[in-house]
Amino acid sequence: GGAFSGIVNLTNSTFALTADNAAALASATLKLSANNVTTVGTTDRTIQGLDLSGGTLIFDGAAPQSQATGVVSVTDLALNSGTISVTGTDSWNNDTPVVAPNLSILAQDRGDIMLALINAGTVTGDAGALNLMINGTSVNSGSQAVLSTVTQGGVTVANATHNYGLTSSDGNGGTGLYVNYSLSALELLTDGSNALLLATESGATANRELNARLSGIGGVQVDAINGALTLANGNNSYSGTTTVNAGTLILGADGAFGQTSLLNVLSGASTNINGHSQTVGAL
């Protein structure tokens, strides 16, 4: 039962953090040492302590989520060495409106998004001492891009590029272990009614500026009814249609509408060139 309060040191083994196993560790510390592989699964678990010292800890989750499917809560967390492996789908749906814990494209573009893995009362060690793998791809913090596909209405509309890293702070006073990630690029694959939809969200803290680079033969549809949307990357090169369905689309840099073949502004919507310059194929 959970009365045991010592250290369970796992080496050369596999282990699943099931409900029964978590209950047995309620007052104990789980130490993951060399050649151990432990799987969290898809349910939140709580144990007393967790010591990462050479083993591998596997979570289920991926962008665009804000937390793993199963999050571990501990009183004490030691980050010494080992590997964090996050395995989830490499395809995600561009839902509007977004359903938590998923995040919108614009929220992913903020650069400070956290995928919560472990919530801890105290943390020792350094997240930088751990290796990170995303869907089998080894990630050098902040520099290794990981690709995924974006679907919309059952159609694959874009290829997304994210950059990932590990941190022990969520930026809001919380401690534990988090994957911080940001959306850096979108390759647009479709146009017209199947073009990628960029929709602004309500709320004072909502991000309404897209800095990710847009490329590809596809286009974008803009729904800015919850606040004007700014396309801010002057290196955008997409060649499809830019359709403003509602609200205002703002040109945030010279050429931020890429090589768009058509700027189509529907009745009641608007575009603000904002003092910048832009060439379009047609209006």
What is each stretch, according to the model?
Residues 184-199:
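Disulfide-bonded cysteine-rich modules in secreted/extracellular proteins
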Residues 82, 184, 219:
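Residue-level marker of positions within ordered structural domains that often coincide
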Residues 176, 195, 207, 219:
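A residue-level signal for beta-strand positions that form part of recognition/binding surfaces
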Residues 1-76, 92-107, 128, 185, ...:
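Surface-exposed loop/turn positions within long extracellular repeat scaffolds
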Residues 174-182:
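Short, structured interface segments
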Residues 42-175:
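Extracellular, surface-exposed repeat/solenoid domains
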Residues 220-225:
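Primary detection of the long, small/polar-rich alpha-helical "axial" segments characteristic
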